[in-house]
């Protein structure tokens, strides 16, 4: 189920007409919001260098990756932690650890080039 969600999420990471933050001073092309088709997580990905400071919301939990201008923000029943990605992971790979609602286990989503049946999930942009 996690693999299927990750693949669908990857396919849905394309520009949309209605972006979170539109009208708050964020350049629309640098802000993307994606909700998983199975509704177990929600992410916002944006380019930090092009986002203006805003006092409208409290600081979210974030995960910082190799590319320091990218932030992954969780909302809802989430647990943000460092991804289990290694130095050999492809550049511009996002990784995250999140709690699946209704369970006590944490699931990982990280860049992985292994065959689908051997990986935890791959999310890229």
Swiss-Prot record:
Residues 113-125 have a biased composition (Basic and acidic residues). Disruption phenotype: Decreases the production of aspercryptin by more than 80% but increases the titer of aspercryptin with Ile replaced by Val more than six-fold. Part of the gene cluster that mediates the biosynthesis of aspercryptins, linear lipopeptides built from six amino acids including 2 highly unusual and nonproteogenic amino acids, 2-amino-octanoic acid (2aoa) and 2-amino-dodecanol (2adol). The core structure of aspercryptins is as follows: Ser/Ala-Thr-Ile/Val-2aoa-Asn-2adol. The first step of aspercryptin biosynthesis is the generation of the fatty acid precursors, octanoic and dodecanoic acids, by the FAS subunits atnF and atnM. The fatty acid precursors are likely transformed into the corresponding alpha-amino fatty acids in three steps. Pathway: Secondary metabolite biosynthesis. This is Aspercryptin biosynthesis cluster protein K. Transmembrane segments: none annotated. The gene is atnK. It comes from the Eukaryota. Residues 104-125 are annotated as: Disordered. It comes from Emericella nidulans (strain FGSC A4 / ATCC 38163 / CBS 112.46 / NRRL 194 / M139). Induction: Expression is positively regulated by the aspercryptin cluser-specific transcription factor atnN. Coiled coil: none annotated.
């Amino acid at each position: 189920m996690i693999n299927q969600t990750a693949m669908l999420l990857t396919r849905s990471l394309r520009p949309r007409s209605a972006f979170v933050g539109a009208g708050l001073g964020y350049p629309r092309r640098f802000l993307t919001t994606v909700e998983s088709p199975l509704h177990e997580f929600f992410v916002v990905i944006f380019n930090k260098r092009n986002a203006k400071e805003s006092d409208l919301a409290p600081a979210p939990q974030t995960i910082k990756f190799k590319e320091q201008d990218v932030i992954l923000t969780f909302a809802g029943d989430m647990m943000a932690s460092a991804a289990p990605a290694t130095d050999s992971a492809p550049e511009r790979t996002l990784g995250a650890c999140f709690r699946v609602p209704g369970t006590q286990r944490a699931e990982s989503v990280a860049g992985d080039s292994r065959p689908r049946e051997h990986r935890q999930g791959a999310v890229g942009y």
